[in-house]
Regions:
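Positively charged, low-complexity, intrinsically disordered RNA-binding extensions
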Residues: 156-157
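Nucleotide/phosphate-binding catalytic cleft detector across ATP-hydrolyzing
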Residues: 1-151, 160-276, 283-306, 310, ...
Length: 342
């Protein structure tokens, strides 16, 4: 029996969905041999090795800002994930894979090629924001503007949708990983302590917020003292983490405002009378929905399963081929226009 496979090949996480069931969810990271560049581990195993590797091995993140940064590793990772989740089938799975709207035709084709070599057939690429809209059950086939924001780990996709198509779209190179980087820089500057990416991520999840918390929270964190080089245990507050994150949040909202400013007034009016739909793992960062609603003076909807909206929408898109063909045509025209302006 033919298999349909929807993929969210994200900067920090890869999710495979088949038959409305998540069949694989793994970090988008590999451990490779430094000399041969041959992968020795993928996913959770590779993530657990970050910061703990011997000299002959290194961590590689094949997707950067939503685009393929290392084609060979990306291809081998998809092959590994396909095999682990599906086993061996006589009929290759039909594949649809999400990608930021800012991707060029060359970048889109590169991703299609990687998925085909990994074992997919009839590979399609869908815009992440469109997939997110479908995954949230938004009907944008009728007149009336809908605004969808997909905040991923490395990139944020912003789209104005109406009448079954894209009115305005953009991809901003800002995501939830930038909050982690901001926390690392803040701790280094204010505490003279170096912390790793995983520690920063935990601080973001536990006490992070892009708005001041009503009650101060203090937790202990571990790092390495920059002067002595020794391990150090230190107290960090929710206010510290807020101060670390707030500038990145402002950069994110500036990118969103830029799309709104380029959108026809009637579509903007529709959005303001309805709500803004926010999805992606970054949507779950504390205070994002609150601050966005306050800045734009409108309601914001974030679902509890926001990090899976894109892959669910990608699967739903397989049942609407005409809609996807129309949107793909629009995106290619938008990219051609941008290229001509450059």
């Amino acid at each position: 029996m033919p298999i349909d496979l929807a993929i969210d090949f994200g900067t920090s996480k890869t999710v495979l969905l088949s038959g409305n069931k998540i069949i694989l969810e793994q970090p988008t990271v590999a451990t490779v041999d430094s000399e041969t560049w041959e992968p020795v581990a993928f996913g959770d195993k590779a993530r657990d090795m970050i910061g703990r590797l011997p000299e002959h091995l290194e961590s590689v993140f094949p997707i950067q800002r939503g685009m393929i940064a290392d084609y060979d590793v990306a291809e081998q990772m998809l092959t590994e994930y396909f095999t682990n989740s599906l086993g061996k089938h006589l009929i290759k799975p039909r594949v649809i894979i999400a990608m930021p709207s800012g991707a060029t035709s060359i970048q889109r084709r590169s991703l299609e090629n990687a998925a085909e070599i990994a074992g997919g057939r009839k590979v399609q690429v869908i815009d992440s924001a469109v997939a997110a809209a479908l995954g949230m059950g938004i009907d944008f086939t009728r007149p009336g503007g809908k605004m969808v924001i997909d905040i991923g780990a490395g990139v944020t996709d912003i789209a104005m949708l109406s009448g079954g198509g894209i009115v305005q779209c953009d991809s901003a190179p800002i995501g939830s990983l930038d909050f982690d980087d901001a926390i690392i820089k803040y701790v280094r500057k204010e505490f003279n302590v170096l912390i790793g990416q995983l520690t920063a991520e935990e601080l973001k999840k536990q006490i992070g917020s892009v708005v001041p918390r009503k009650e101060e929270v203090i937790i202990k964190a571990k790092g390495r003292n920059l002067f002595s080089g020794l391990p150090q245990l230190f107290d960090i507050t929710s206010t510290d983490v807020y101060l670390a994150m707030k500038d990145t949040a402002q950069n994110l909202f500036s990118a969103i405002n830029s799309v709104i400013e380029r959108t026809p007034p009637d579509i903007v009016a529709d959005v303001m009378c309805d709500k803004i739909y926010v999805t992606g793992g970054g949507a779950l960062v504390n205070g994002v929905a609150e601050l966005l609603g306050k800045n734009l003076n409108t309601d914001v909807l974030v679902r509890s399963d926001a990090e899976y909206s894109v892959v669910k929408g990608a699967q739903a898109a397989l049942k609407q081929p005409d809609l996807i063909k129309n949107i793909d045509y629009q995106l290619r025209n938008i990219q051609d226009l941008i290229s001509n302006l450059e």
